[in-house]
Regions:
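EF-hand Ca2+-binding helix-loop-helix modules
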Residues: 39-64, 75-76, 80-84, 103-138, ...
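Short capping micro-motif at the N-terminus of alpha-helices
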Residues: 76, 100, 150, 174, ...
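EF-hand and EF-hand-like Ca2+-sensor regions
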Residues: 88, 94-115, 156-158, 162, ...
Length: 722
């Protein structure tokens, strides 16, 4: 079923459950979160993983949208409900809504989960922020970047009609719940950090009066005023206020009060002119100078637009003028308070196309969101690069307008320089698979039309070259081969077009290191490269959510869809799950410690055919399990990993202590890298919803995960590492 189904269900589900203008019922987010955290009632989850968001949403949707009260929701009823919501939300009476306006309308009626920001009402951040861009993208039939009542109605009608497999004229609660659980990825805020997907808003073309392709100070000022007027006209509150903090329980980070950092100048810090930009043994200092003092507010206003804020970058005494800066990230932006550290993207070639530092032209500076150890990204990168091409990573100190903003992760861009270093050529097609609420970028075959693939895969290389070389057609063919080729001939069919062993290493790392933002759970957040010979390669992208418990919802149906008692995460289908029910291992479930993630979880998840299809081939499954065993035996051995962690601790501990804008405490860092810590939870004991996720030290995770994998029956039978 096309991507539309998931987003429209989110649309209807949020409307029905959360008392929007469409419905008018009361909703307490903490009650629903508590229900989700407890898992399904005994006996509810059927084979194949019946537990999921639909279990809670569907009955309310049917009850509230069922106009004729026949116990079913028909396509017509769904369409009328969706159209009414868009019509009521169109405060500016423009006849349609863009994503920002739709998101704010949802947020005005949808209470944020506890801990997502200040107590006062706000429409600038909430579940609608995550849902709206994907809804508009999916339902926008005329591709004008907006959703009209008519488009909403047609999309909602199509979802219900397509999901009505028995052609009964509509869906009852059970049918709707089943369709939702089959088609929905993690619901916003539950299934792993994500964020508002959709396309960025294009402002440069409208405000670039001098035609130089970028906005100067006066042009940016005009654009900001226009943005504020648009939001006010559509019922918004302008630029968001004091910001939104992370939800409580995400690791007990002990966030410290923010205050200004020390003043630093180039003469106060060491320079490393002979060291690479990604040398792991140093902490280089980057100086950014913005022309305006309200640079943070300005970048917040331009978030999710095509506007770069210009600055001067100084590295090792070298002045690099005309760089462009914007905030990057989704949950790492939207759940971080203003004044605290947010991730940055710096384009060195913003004005001067030839400007680089050490051969690199893009900097990705990460705020270590949800990682009190600060080490997840650098460790994942170091381990992954042992087995396949992956971005390099190290640490830098960032000084903005003379004030230290502390320690950032510095992660290599997936660009031509990356290709040259890892594949010996700058040629070929590159795609980014961005995280999205639907988590549907896993190479599922969606037919021969290009549109659905362009929605899921963001081409980062030349469009002209992609057309000339047939790269999009080749990507569609890869998806088709995965989908339609029998297991006994799949390896031979894939070998000319996919680096199969590289894909198996990619999947093994994803699972062995429990990447909560990984392919296995989100079907997104990775990169794809097609080399000049026509072979595809998979490259890790988002690495900060590894080395810990899985997020609440992962692939439906657990391992092989065995349902209750399936080997996804311990007895009962979930870690410590109730007898007689359980999701069969939905991404580890809310109480999973993460160390018990089954290496064969989610093989029936249609969103992730690389796992389901490749591992259905006995020889490839055996090779994958051998790779998992290699990672467990070698890379997770604390005799190997411990000295690396200790080296980084010695390098950055003083930096973290001095960091006044960090998202976690010094004590949390010290606990994360401690050699002496509470042991990892015993098998089946779980870690408690939320907080246990980040209370496990790196050593406890490595020891526990290694032990679990090497004792796993399937892994034990795999060939040992060479």
């Amino acid at each position: 079923m096309p991507r539309t189904s998931m987003e429209i269900l989110l649309f209807l589900g949020s409307a029905a459950m959360l008392g929007l203008g469409l419905l008018g019922i009361d909703y307490e987010p903490d009650e629903v979160q508590a229900e989700l955290a407890q898992g399904p009632p005994p006996g509810v989850a059927g084979p194949g993983g019946g537990f999921g968001p639909g279990m809670f949403l569907a009955p309310v949707i049917v009850e509230e949208a069922d106009a004729d009260k026949d116990g079913r929701i028909s396509p017509e009823e769904a369409g009328k409900a969706a159209a009414k919501f868009v019509r009521d939300a169109d405060k500016a009476e423009k006849g349609s809504l863009e994503a920002d306006a739709l998101g704010r309308a949802v947020n005005r009626r949808m209470p944020r989960p506890p801990g997502f920001g200040p107590d006062e009402p706000s429409d600038e951040f909430g579940p609608g922020t995550f849902m709206a861009p994907a809804i508009v993208e999916a339902a926008d039939a005329d591709k004008d970047g907006r959703i009209s009542p008519e488009e909403a109605a047609k999309a909602a009608e199509k979802f219900v009609r397509d999901a009505d497999a028995d052609k009964k004229g509509g869906l009852d609660s059970d049918g709707l719940a089943k369709a939702m659980n089959q088609r929905m990825g993690p619901p916003p805020g539950f299934g792993g950090p994500g964020g508002p997907g959709g396309k960025e808003r294009k402002l440069v073309k409208d405000f670039d009066k001098d035609g130089d392709g970028r906005l100067n100070q006066a042009e940016r000022r005009a654009a900001r005023e226009s943005l504020k007027k648009d939001k006010a006209a559509e019922g918004g509150r302008g630029r968001r206020g004091p910001g939104f903090g992370p939800p409580p329980g995400f690791g007990g980070r002990g966030e410290e009060p923010v205050k200004s950092g020390p003043r630093l100048a180039a003469g106060d810090v060491a320079a490393y002119p002979g060291k690479s930009l990604y040398d792991p043994s140093i902490v280089r200092t980057l100086f950014l100078e913005f022309e305006d003092g309200d640079w943070e507010a300005e970048m917040a206003d331009f978030n999710r637009t095509d506007v770069e804020v210009p600055a001067v970058l100084t590295i090792d005494g070298r002045r690099l003028p005309g760089v462009g800066v914007h905030f990057r990230g989704m949950s790492s932006y939207f759940t971080v308070r203003e004044g605290h550290k947010r991730s940055l993207n710096v384009s060195l070639d913003f004005v001067n196309l030839d400007q680089k530092f050490d051969g690199y032209k893009t900097l990705n500076l990460l705020n270590s969101h949800e990682d009190p150890s600060f080490l997840h990204t650098v460790l994942y990168s170091e381990i992954a690069r042992t087995y396949l091409p992956a971005p390099k990573a190290n640490f830098v100190r960032v000084v903005i307008n003379g004030e230290s903003w502390g320690l950032y992760g510095n992660v290599q861009q997936f660009d031509k320089k990356f290709l040259a270093e890892n594949f010996g050529t700058e040629d070929g097609a590159r795609w980014k698979v961005p995280g999205n609420p639907g988590a549907d970028g896993g190479l599922r075959y969606l037919g021969e039309e290009l549109g659905p693939y362009e929605e899921r895969f963001e081409l980062k290389s030349s469009k002209a070259s992609a057309r000339k070389n047939g790269d999009w057609k080749a990507l569609i063919e890869l998806c088709r081969v995965l989908d339609e080729t029998p297991a006994d001939t799949l390896e031979a069919a894939l070998d000319p077009i996919l680096d199969v062993d590289g894909a198996l290493w990619f999947l093994a790392l994803d699972i062995a290191l429990v990447n909560g933002d990984g392919y296995w759970t989100r079907a997104s957040d990775y990169s794809i490269y097609r080399d000049p010979r026509g072979k595809f390669h998979l490259v890790p992208h988002d690495m900060n959510e590894a080395f810990g418990p899985a997020m609440m919802f992962g692939p439906p149906g657990g391992r092989g869809g065995r349902g209750p008692g399936g080997p996804g995460f311990g007895p009962g289908g979930g870690p410590g799950g109730r007898p007689g029910g359980g999701p069969g291992g939905m991404g580890g479930g809310p109480r999973s410690s993460g160390i018990e993630l089954d290496p064969l979880v989610g093989l029936d998840d249609e969103r992730t055919p690389l796992r389901g299809k490749l591992l259905a081939v006995p020889a490839l499954k055996a090779r994958y399990l051998s790779h998992v065993r290699t990672i467990a035996e070698k890379s997770l051995d604390w005799k190997t990993l411990g000295p690396i962690v200790e080296g980084y601790r010695a390098l950055i501990e003083k930096e973290i202590e001095a960091d006044t804008r960090k998202l976690s405490s010094l004590a949390a860092f010290q606990k994360s890298v401690s050699e002496v810590d509470a042991p990892a939870p015993a098998p089946g004991a779980g870690g408690g919803p939320g907080r246990g996720r980040r209370e496990m030290s790196l050593k406890a995770f490595a020891d526990g995960r290694r032990r679990y994998l090497l004792e796993n029956a399937d892994v034990k039978k795999a060939a040992p590492p060479k």
